[in-house]
Amino acid sequence: MSTVAPDLRGRIHREKRLMKPEEAGEFLRTQKIAHVGTVDPNGWPYVVPLVYIYEGGDLLFFHTGEHPGHFLTNLQNNARICVEVSEIGDLHRGRPYACNSALVYTSVIVFGPVKVLDGPESRPKKTWFLDRLLAKYGKSEWSFEPGYPLIDRIILYEQKMEVVTGKHSSGLSH
């Protein structure tokens, strides 16, 4: 007898903490690091922190180097990923017990398949990505020679954002 587990993607326990979709999108636009989760062929989870670009809509972009490793091998086996982006604030002291303390935080979880963009046909999209990456993470006073001569040495990933859930806590209650 086979039992199908319920799809729990996008569900949260405390509805009052649920962010509106536009709040989750704005949070994704402004944060710096995404933790990207994959599963290897033996069922082991693997999470890696990556810089990313999100400019609205339902696509999230990130990249790695060209060398095959754990991350790319996992994606070749299973293209479904989970991305987590968070910001942690202060711990608010609880009374009368320490376990009444609560953390200020915001987090967004994104589920969806990822597409690997590689090869000569991906150069325009890789150029777009690298331009956005430098604008987001670089400094305005930096200047470079035009072009990206090492562009073929990166792999670009495009995640289709199927399920997005954001939540936040003010730290004032559990």
Where are these regions (language model features)?
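Short, basic/aromatic recognition patches
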Residues: 7-35
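Charged, gly/pro-rich active-site loop segments
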Residues: 1-16, 88-174
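A generic structural signal for short beta-strands and their flanking turns/coil linkers
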Residues: 32, 48, 58, 77-84, ...
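Short solvent-exposed loop/turn micro-motifs enriched in small/polar/acidic residues
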Residues: 29-31, 44-46, 101, 151-152
